[in-house]
Amino acid sequence: ILQLIEPFERDGTLVKRDRTEIERDIANYTIIDHDGVIFACAALYPYPEAKTGEMAALTVSPQSQGQGDGEKVLRRVEQRARAMGLESIFVLTTRTMHWFLKRGFVQVDPDWLPDARKRKYNWDRRSMVFVKKLS
């Protein structure tokens, strides 16, 4: 996971995560692999009190982009969220808003975020918030 996300952290697309954080949160991650090589991943951080969850660190390897791995990760994250009883998932992004809009997400104000997440929101980063209702 670290090797996959590191280039995107370096260019500012993703927020930096260290090995300790990823290891601590490994159960939150969904991966797509081919022959043992990880080509896509995303983490789901639930906010059960708000019946929503944050999909974070959605990353697809450049070699795999356009081949449906991002869609597969999204579907798996949605399935996990539904199994947890969540009614929506949200993402914070600075660059890939069109990808999310094409997949049923809608932009909302950062004030929409659950209080626990709002307290950690980095206003300097100016991330846009997108939400998708799960059916």
Where is each model-derived feature located?
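Short amphipathic alpha-helix that is part of the acyltransferase structural core
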Residues: 1-17, 33-34, 126-129, 133-135
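Short loop/turn motifs at secondary-structure junctions and domain boundaries
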Residues: 20-26
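Conserved beta-strand in the GNAT
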Residues: 31, 37-46, 52-59
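Conserved acetyl-CoA-binding loop-helix of GNAT-fold acetyltransferases
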Residues: 60, 66-79, 83, 91
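Conserved catalytic-core motifs of GNAT/GCN5-like acyltransferases
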Residues: 92, 101, 106-129
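A generic "binding-loop/recognition-motif" signal
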Residues: 95-96
